[in-house]
């Protein structure tokens, strides 16, 4: 389930806001210029679906947001827990950075944690299946896919080189907990 927690950037122990309500999450994020939406597929997306099948299932929303924001390229990324490069991939964006274009992701499956650093606040957004997040360009943030990453996401780009991470060199990301998604409970 999606979740937003907001902290003072000097107090990673106690959230000032904590919600799993999609409308409340969207409302809070809108205050800092971040878009949060819930999408639903027009057709079932089965495990092992091709990128084209994934994009076809969300075509209306993809076309809408691409037209609204001027995206030129859309792709699908899929990361599984058994990926031999999972640690390297996770480490790539764990430190605070920004991009020179909006970072827009839609989670078709799985989850990940976007953490934004805006105006002395830290916004932890756990994105799960059916969540779209659009982080404005130059917003300081980091992303954690967890120790056993599992997600399929649609990514949107305006320029191929715009999505390069520009790292700040600060240690703030290390002050906040790493992402550890809840595992489903097994019946006893």
Swiss-Prot record:
Keyword Ribosomal protein in annotation: no
Site feature: May play a role in transmitting local conformational changes: 102
Cross-referenced Pfam families: ARD (PF03079)
GO biological process: L-methionine salvage from methylthioadenosine; L-methionine salvage from S-adenosylmethionine
GO molecular-function terms, A-Z: acireductone dioxygenase (Ni2+-requiring) activity; acireductone dioxygenase [iron(II)-requiring] activity; iron ion binding; nickel cation binding
Cofactors, names only: Fe(2+); Ni(2+)
InterPro entries: ARD, ARD_bac, RmlC-like_jellyroll, RmlC_Cupin_sf
Ribosomal protein keyword on record: no
Pathway where it operates: Amino-acid biosynthesis; L-methionine biosynthesis via salvage pathway; L-methionine from S-methyl-5-thio-alpha-D-ribose 1-phosphate: step 5/6
Residues binding Fe(2+), per UniProt: 97, 99, 103, 141
Bound cofactor: record note: Binds 1 Fe(2+) cation per monomer. Binds 1 nickel ion per monomer.
Residues noted as binding Ni(2+) in the record, renumbered to the chain: 97, 99, 103, 141
Complexes and interactors: Monomer.
Key words of the record: Amino-acid biosynthesis, Dioxygenase, Iron, Metal-binding, Methionine biosynthesis, Nickel, Oxidoreductase
Organism for this UniProt entry: Xanthomonas oryzae pv. oryzae (strain KACC10331 / KXO85)
EC identifiers of the protein: 1.13.11.54, 1.13.11.53
Gene that this sequence comes from: mtnD
Catalytic activity: 1,2-dihydroxy-5-(methylsulfanyl)pent-1-en-3-one + O2 = 3-(methylsulfanyl)propanoate + CO + formate + 2 H(+); 1,2-dihydroxy-5-(methylsulfanyl)pent-1-en-3-one + O2 = 4-methylsulfanyl-2-oxobutanoate + formate + 2 H(+)
This protein's name: Acireductone dioxygenase
Function: Catalyzes 2 different reactions between oxygen and the acireductone 1,2-dihydroxy-3-keto-5-methylthiopentene (DHK-MTPene) depending upon the metal bound in the active site. Fe-containing acireductone dioxygenase (Fe-ARD) produces formate and 2-keto-4-methylthiobutyrate (KMTB), the alpha-ketoacid precursor of methionine in the methionine recycle pathway. Ni-containing acireductone dioxygenase (Ni-ARD) produces methylthiopropionate, carbon monoxide and formate, and does not lie on the methionine recycle pathway.
Site residues, Important to generate the dianion: 105
Annotated site, May play a role in metal incorporation in vivo, chain positions: 96
Protein family: Belongs to the acireductone dioxygenase (ARD) family.
């Amino acid at each position: 389930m999606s979740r937003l927690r907001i902290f003072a950037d000097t107090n990673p122990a106690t959230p000032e806001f904590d919600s799993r309500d999609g409308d409340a999450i969207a409302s809070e994020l809108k205050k800092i210029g971040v878009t949060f939406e819930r999408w639903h597929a027009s057709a079932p997306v089965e495990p092992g679906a091709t990128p084209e099948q994934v994009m076809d299932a969300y075509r209306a929303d993809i076309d809408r947001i691409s037209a609204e924001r001027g995206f030129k390229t859309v792709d699908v990324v899929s990361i599984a827990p058994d990926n031999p490069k999972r640690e390297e991939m996770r480490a790539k964006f764990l430190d605070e950075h920004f991009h020179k274009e909006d970072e827009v992701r839609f989670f078709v499956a799985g989850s990940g944690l976007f953490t934004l650093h805006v105006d002395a606040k830290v916004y932890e957004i756990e994105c799960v299946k059916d969540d779209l997040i659009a982080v404005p360009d130059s917003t300081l943030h980091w992303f954690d896919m967890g120790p056993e990453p599992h997600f399929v996401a649609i990514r949107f780009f305006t320029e191929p080189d715009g999505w390069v991470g520009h790292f700040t060199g600060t240690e703030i990301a290390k002050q906040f907990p790493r992402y550890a998604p809840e595992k489903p409970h097994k019946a006893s």
